[in-house]
Every structure is written in C-alpha cells, then in structure tokens.
C-alpha cells in the first residue's frame, strides 16, 4: 500500500483506475506492486462477458508472463502453434516465429474468465476493487482545470447512489466509450481507422484446434451460380472447452461499413461452412454480440492534466490485425511505470515525469500504427484484397513476413532480415 505521506487526507487513493479490463487490471497490478495505493473502479461485477475473439498471439502471452500469470495449459489455457490463413482457395499454416523477445506459442481463454483472472491478480497485490461503480465524468480543479477525481454512481436499482473519489492521478481504462475523455471534450479522431467485430460461440468438434484460424475471404454461396464475396474477414478460434469462438470484423475503409447488418453477415458466411463444424443456430451457446474496435491512436492526447488514456480509451487496437489485449496491457505497464516515478516526486515536479507516457507510446507504436493506417486503406479496396490473397498466400516466405508484420512480432535487436526490414519501416514512418 502507499505511504500516508504521499496521500492527502482529502484523497481516496494515490491513483484511481477506471475500468478493470486488461488495461486497468494490468496497470493496477504494477501500481500496487510499486507500493502505491490504487483504487480500481469497475462498472460491472465479475465474472462478466466481453465481446472479443479470445485469442492471444505470443505478444499477448508475453504480457501475461511479465505480469506473473500462470500461462500453462494445466492452468486453464489452450495453447496454439500459429495462424492458419484461408483464402483464394489456399489454406496455409504459419508457425509463430521463434524470437528472443516473445514466447513461441499463443493462447486462448474466454474473456469472461480472462478478465476476472487479471483483476483478482491485481487484488492479491493490494489494489482495492469497487465493482458496480459506473464512472461518468472527471472532477476538475476549478482553478487549474486539472483532473482531481471522478464521479458517478455505485450500486444497482434502489441501492444506486452517487459517488465521487479523489486522487492526484487518474487512469482512464474505460474502453471504447471513453466517458472520462469525453467529459473533458476529448473526441475521437476521424482520420484514424475504426473497426466493428461480431462473434458467437458454438458447440463444435473444432474446439481443440491448435491454430488460430483467419479467413481472408468470406463467401455467400447460397446461389452456386452467383457466389458473392462478403466484406470483412473472419476468425475461428477453438476454446478447448467444447466451444468455438467464431466471428467477423469489418473496417471503416470498406464501402459496406455501417451499411450492412453485421450479425446477418456472420450468418451468411457461416451457413456456407461445413455442416460437421456445427456453426448453426441449434449449436449456438449465446446470441451474436458486437463491439467497436478503436484503432491507431484514434483518441489523443494520451496524457493531459492528470488523466492518462489506456487501451481502447486511447484507441490502441492494432490496425493490422484488430488485436487489442496486448496493447491494452502494454499501455497499462507503461502508464504504471510512469505514474510510479511521478508520484514519488514532489507535486510541482510530477508533470515532467507524466509527459513521458505519451512519448513512450509514440516511440513504441507511432510508426507501426502509421503503417497500419496505410494497410487499412489498401485492404479496404476489394480488388487490392483480392490480388493480395491470390498472389500472396501461395508464397510462404512472403506470408511469414506478413505474419510478423501484422502480429507485430519482431526482435528489435539481432533479428533476422524480416525483423530488420519491419523495424526499419516503423522507424522511417512518421509517428501516429
């Protein structure tokens, strides 16, 4: 816990973390580990469901290992060997690359279980969790405009009551809704990509698949004489518990974005999959649900006036592959390190330390996300996507390079030629 000398009598914690998803729980864990008094506020109660593909690349697994989470299969994880890519009449299995910086396996776990695992980990290290607490806006100092706390409601039904909490630093981990940022007038950038994903679970014999599977082409073959290419991309991730997570995503660079029924689109694709996979309504375990994917730093600045934006609240989903969990967790680690350094200084010296957070994000992801924006614009053109699928998939070496690029899996030093090319491109690209 934090020392009393750093916390003023009127303050409820040294750091308030709003949202107990991967970003919030990761930040709370590292902050508590650093000896700070952390208040973690979550609008729901655990366990709770989140719309997600549930699949982690080695980048995500690394964050779990760094956090101290047991990632063995005996601990409830289903490991995978790599990515299976399907498109253009080709099916290609690509093993995760062997790297110094990342493990050589991915993992799958339902978000309902995953998020609770992370938040309990944070609690064990000393973070104080308040569930059923919906934070709606920031409290600002009338003189300086600095964020000094948050306000909202706690409880349900007739027990609901207004609440407010105060701390010298607040971490906004409140997801795509970004209520705290919006309460300060921080809107999203329209020049950044946005995606939408929908998914459903099915009881299926494919539950123990040892690869994450990505479909680059989604076909509606209900009329065999006139097959139609549907917009978007699909995934099939075995969960290891008898079920499979099946979903699709679509980017706002597609002409179909916002103009189609995404749930119907998913059904159109799945009705053309083999019967034995059981991707039919009678085998569903829950209804189709969807969520937005804020990409490429679509909300900035990531630090201002005592408020840090983490994960989806700061638009940190990878534009290349729609992956959000690793970047949410990494932003939690960055934010916690900067916050710990800042809060051990005198108040008049903290701002300089806190300004290191957005700089660290830009250095780590800025050039990569700029390349991602270019990639998203290109694949939004169906003809470009068709050509990439037709001529790219049969070339294994090219696809190995593509896997490293899309999953952001390279060694920064002493990597192979592919690593050097990717790292060089990200350094040359202007920061997002």
Task: Specify the residue positions occupied by each region the protein language model found.
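Glycine-rich FAD pyrophosphate-binding loop
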Residues: 32-52
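Beta1/beta-strand and adjacent pyrophosphate-binding region of the FAD-binding site
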Residues: 6-23
């Amino acid at each position: 816990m934090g020392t009393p000398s750093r916390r003023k009598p009127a303050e409820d914690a040294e750091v308030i973390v709003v949202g107990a998803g991967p970003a919030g729980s990761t930040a709370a864990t590292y902050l508590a580990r650093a000896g700070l008094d952390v208040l973690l506020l979550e609008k729901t109660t655990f366990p709770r469901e989140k719309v997600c593909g549930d699949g982690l690349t080695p980048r995500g697994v690394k964050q779990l290992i760094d956090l101290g989470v047991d990632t063995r299969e005996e601990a409830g994880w289903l490991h995978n060997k790599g990515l299976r890519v399907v498109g253009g009449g080709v099916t290609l299995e690509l093993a995760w690359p062997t790297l110094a910086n990342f493990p050589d396996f991915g993992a799958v776990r339902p978000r309902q279980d995953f998020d609770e695992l992370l938040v309990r980990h944070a609690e064990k290290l000393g973070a104080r969790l308040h569930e059923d607490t919906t934070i709606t806006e920031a409290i600002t100092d009338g003189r300086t405009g600095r964020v000094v706390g948050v306000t909202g409601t706690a409880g349900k039904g007739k027990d609901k009551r207004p609440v407010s909490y105060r701390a010298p630093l607040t971490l906004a981990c409140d997801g795509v809704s970004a209520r705290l940022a919006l309460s300060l007038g921080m809107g999203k950038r329209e020049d950044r990509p946005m995606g939408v994903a929908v998914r459903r679970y099915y009881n299926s014999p494919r539950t123990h698949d040892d690869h994450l599977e990505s479909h680059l082409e989604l076909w509606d073959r209900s009329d065999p004489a006139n097959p139609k290419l549907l917009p978007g991309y699909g995934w099939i991730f075995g969960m290891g518990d008898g079920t499979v997570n099946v979903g699709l995503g679509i980017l706002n660079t597609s002409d179909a974005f916002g103009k189609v029924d995404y749930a119907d689109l998913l059904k159109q694709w799945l009705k053309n999959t083999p019967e034995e996979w059981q991707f039919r309504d009678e085998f569903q375990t829950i209804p189709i649900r969807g969520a937005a994917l804020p990409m490429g730093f679509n909300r900035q600045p990531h630090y201002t006036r005592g408020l840090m934006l983490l994960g989806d609240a700061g638009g940190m989903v990878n534009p290349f592959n729609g992956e959000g969990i690793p970047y949410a967790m990494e932003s939690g680690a960055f934010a916690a390190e900067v916050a710990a350094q800042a809060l051990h200084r005198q108040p008049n010296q903290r701002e300089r330390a806190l300004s290191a957070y957005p700089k660290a994000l830009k250095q780590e992801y800025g050039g990569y996300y700029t390349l991602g924006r270019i990639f998203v614009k290109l694949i939004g053109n169906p003809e470009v996507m068709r050509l990439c699928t037709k001529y790219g998939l049969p070339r294994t070496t090219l696809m190995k390079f593509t896997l490293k690029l899309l999953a952001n899996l390279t060694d920064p030093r002493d990597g192979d030629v592919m690593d050097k090319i990717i790292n060089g491109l990200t350094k040359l690209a202007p920061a997002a």
